């Protein structure tokens, strides 16, 4: 009797341990999915909720979508070309209709069409050089240079005064070049004139029987443009801006006249750069400007010392 009850207890404990191990080995179910198993759920494509397309249908749909996209792009491109061509035609008709039709043919005046900006510093043309006495500018620059060098203590001590290339022969510039420096920003463009306008020294290209044209440069004076705009509403720029020092505002052009060969009231400097040999291997480099008066801006001395090229700044213009 005891052995039978003992066997029953062992069997019960064995079954309990097996069932406990099975429960521990099983995965705890997700409380969010008590009644369903998410592993068996299929993800349905939202684009094809009611249909299950085959591969052939997908290829056809992609081809249709690509053709629609291409047609939309072509339509937008065609519309953009039409708008841009219409704007270009309107701009062309407005500019050339006003400049040629109204100003040149009707009013018989010169007209300027701006094209692109150009730098302020540029070389003189052959026609402009005819009206500039380069030899006189060179002579004045050499005179100013020798004056500055003769007053410099280093030149007095090492080279002596007066300065001479050799006995009885004064120093002269070895190289001398000039160019122009405009004050205001400059724009290159087409200058159009009536076909029967008087001839001048410039080279013109005729468009018979309408007009003639040439490429030229014009300066843009923002202050005069602002004066014109304010003058239309009855306001003067002096009412808004008070110039404390007129010489600082106008610079060297306060009492200057524009060159008579220029196309308009353009203020410009004549800039120059020269070289003068001082001694056997010493070289003087000088540069400056010329408008009403000639001014030196900088004078440098270049010479070799211990097989090295050394630069001495003998004079540099300081602006107050």
UniProtKB/Swiss-Prot annotation:
GO cellular component: mitochondrial membrane
Superkingdom, taxonomy of origin: Eukaryota
Compartments where found: Mitochondrion membrane
TM region positions: 83-102
Major location (coarse): mitochondrion
Species: Lachancea thermotolerans (strain ATCC 56472 / CBS 6340 / NRRL Y-8284) (Yeast)
Protein name stated in the entry: Altered inheritance of mitochondria protein 39, mitochondrial
The entry's keywords: Membrane, Mitochondrion, Transit peptide, Transmembrane, Transmembrane helix
Bilayer topology term: Single-pass membrane protein
Similarity section: Belongs to the AIM39 family.
Residue span of the annotated presequence: 1-31
């Amino acid at each position: 009797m005891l052995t039978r009850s003992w066997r029953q207890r062992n069997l019960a404990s064995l079954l309990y341990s097996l069932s406990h191990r099975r429960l521990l080995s099983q995965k705890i179910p997700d409380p969010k999915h008590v009644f369903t198993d998410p592993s068996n759920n299929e993800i349905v494509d939202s684009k094809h909720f009611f249909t299950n397309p085959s591969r052939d249908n997908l290829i056809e749909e992609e081809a249709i979508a690509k053709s629609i996209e291409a047609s939309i792009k072509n339509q937008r491109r065609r519309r953009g070309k039409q708008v841009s061509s219409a704007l270009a035609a309107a701009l062309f008709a407005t500019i050339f209709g006003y400049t040629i039709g109204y100003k040149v043919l009707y009013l018989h005046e010169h007209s300027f069409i701006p094209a692109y900006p150009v730098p302020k510093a540029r070389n003189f043309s052959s026609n402009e050089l005819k009206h500039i006495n380069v030899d006189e500018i060179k002579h004045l620059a050499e005179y100013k240079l020798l004056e500055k060098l003769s007053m410099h203590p280093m030149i007095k001590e090492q080279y002596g005064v007066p300065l001479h290339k050799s006995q009885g022969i004064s120093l002269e510039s070895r190289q001398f070049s000039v160019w122009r420096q405009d004050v205001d920003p400059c724009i290159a463009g087409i200058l159009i004139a009536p076909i029967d306008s008087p001839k001048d020294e410039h080279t013109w290209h005729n468009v018979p029987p309408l007009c003639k044209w040439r490429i030229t440069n014009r300066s843009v004076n923002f202050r005069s443009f602002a004066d014109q705009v304010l003058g239309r509403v009855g306001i003067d720029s002096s009412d808004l801006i008070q110039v404390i020092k007129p010489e600082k505002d106008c610079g060297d052009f306060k009492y200057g006249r524009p060159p008579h060969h220029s196309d308009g009231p353009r203020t410009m400097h004549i800039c120059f750069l020269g070289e003068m040999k001082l001694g056997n291997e010493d070289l003087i480099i000088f540069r400056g400007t010329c408008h009403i008066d000639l001014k030196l801006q900088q004078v440098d001395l270049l010479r070799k010392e211990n097989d090295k090229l050394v630069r001495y700044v003998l004079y540099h213009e300081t602006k107050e």
